[in-house]
Regions:
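Conserved acidic
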Residues: 1-424
Length: 424
């Protein structure tokens, strides 16, 4: 892999990669943040006994929809950029086969545009103006990932003969009766025109994975002995680690070039606005630098139940609650106490809300009851304590589960056993 990634020619490859499972101990440090996530269908047999028991008790059922999973198993027909491939090979993964190679001309055609948007966002005086420039930049990236194969033709039909002709067509999908004399007929387009630069969008997505992986494997793991991943998203990541004061300050100084310290207090020793609103740098999740050990505000409490469902609380009692799929009107009812009950008592939080829906272009008001918070997570192999997890599809997952001793609980009691003892 001596081909340079800085030339005018770029490469996207479809490869088969082996995670070198014969030396699983070497990749134990990868388990918290595995390389090369992929979309796969998770079967019930892939889940841990703890998750399966929780499914039976709550009556929950799995869906056959593919989920984005980060695991240590081998990858087949995986598509990635050459720079990303070089990175994973440098960290011990093995290249088994190259299935296809796409060569293209690469230039920084959006560099000036992005730099101008970043400058305008930095100069913004209001939050709405700042968010506006962010949306302008994100919308450009979203158009690059537009899938032309998902387009649908919709025709408004009033005649019976015309409607019958469209329904009998091979391209017919479905129809909606709006009134006795008006029907909407949906059909597949007869031809697909690929007019969006999907290669640019795919390259940006692949390089964003590379930025996250580089930060964890090249910076965090080299500065801290055992960093534990708390949560991660497309543009955010949070690790938990315990270090001595001297080691913490040394690591903080060595990693200062990847952070944006503009949200810290002006009197803080690390405060700087040189990287304010610049892409590619990490900033504090909480105001005034929660990542700084001696700052006035830092993260003091964290609860996480499943993907994109977590709660942060700081020393100054400020909270950040993330709850994907939960309506905003019900999100205010979630807090540290509800997350604590869901994790330690396996309780299910439900809520009722009203919404306006349209059926056949007629507005109705519905009263819905939704499950807001639960411990069910189908993206990780949850161990018997219910508080620790490992990646899915591991050959030694059952052995790890049997020998596991939870560091957050006394002895080998699970969270559910502790709750039963309290009730007794």
């Amino acid at each position: 892999m001596e081909t340079s990634t800085e030339t005018n020619v770029g490469y996207i490859l479809n490869v088969d990669i082996e995670y070198a499972s014969e030396n699983s101990a070497k990749f134990e440090c990868h388990d918290g943040f595995p390389l090369l996530p992929e979309k796969v269908v998770v079967e019930e047999s892939d889940l841990s006994p703890f998750t399966r028991n929780l499914m039976r008790e709550t009556g929950a059922k799995m869906t056959r929809e593919p989920k984005l999973i980060a695991s240590l198993r081998d990858k087949k027909s995986y598509t990635l950029h050459l720079a990303h491939l070089k990175f994973v090979l440098a960290h011990g993964l093995k290249l088994k086969r190259v299935n296809a190679v796409l060569e293209f001309q690469q230039r920084p055609i959006f560099k000036e545009y992005v730099e101008r948007i970043v400058r305008l966002r930095r100069e913004s005086r209001t939050a709405s103006e700042k968010n506006c420039w962010k949306i302008v930049l994100n919308s450009l990236y979203g158009r690059m990932l537009l899938d032309s194969q998902n387009f649908v033709n919709c025709r408004v039909v009033r005649g019976e003969r015309h409607c019958a002709k469209l329904v009998n067509s091979k391209l017919y999908r479905k129809h909606t009766v709006v009134s006795p004399n008006l029907v909407l007929v949906y059909s597949t387009p007869p031809s697909v025109t690929y007019a969006t630069p999907i290669l640019i969008g795919g390259t940006i997505l692949c390089l964003s994975k590379l930025v996250q992986s580089y930060y964890f494997y090249e910076r965090v793991q080299r500065c801290f002995a055992k960093p534990e991943l708390v949560f991660s998203d497309t543009d955010s990541v949070c690790f938990m680690y315990t270090e001595e004061e001297a080691e913490y300050r040394k690591a903080r100084e060595s990693m200062g070039d990847v952070f944006d310290f503009s949200s810290f207090e002006p009197g803080d020793e690390l405060y700087s606005d040189a990287r304010k609103a610049c892409p590619g740098f990490y900033k504090a999740e909480l105001p005034y630098g929660s990542a700084v050990k001696d700052s006035k505000d830092r993260i003091s409490l964290f609860y996480g139940s499943c993907a994109k469902m977590y709660c942060l609380q700081s020393v100054a009692d400020s909270q950040i609650v993330k709850a994907k799929g939960v309506p905003f009107c019900l999100r205010r009812s979630l807090g540290p106490q509800t997350y604590h009950e869901a994790i330690f008592n396996n309780s299910i939080t439900q809520g009722t809300y009203n919404k306006i829906v349209s059926y056949n272009h007629v507005l109705h008001t519905e009263v819905n009851r939704k499950r807001l918070l639960t411990l069910l997570d189908f993206k990780r192999y949850w161990l018997k304590c219910g508080l620790c997890s490992i990646s899915l599809f591991r050959d030694d997952s059952e052995q790890i589960d049997k020998a596991h001793v939870c560091p957050y609980l006394a002895g080998e009691q699970s969270a559910r056993e502790l709750n039963k003892n309290k009730q007794t």
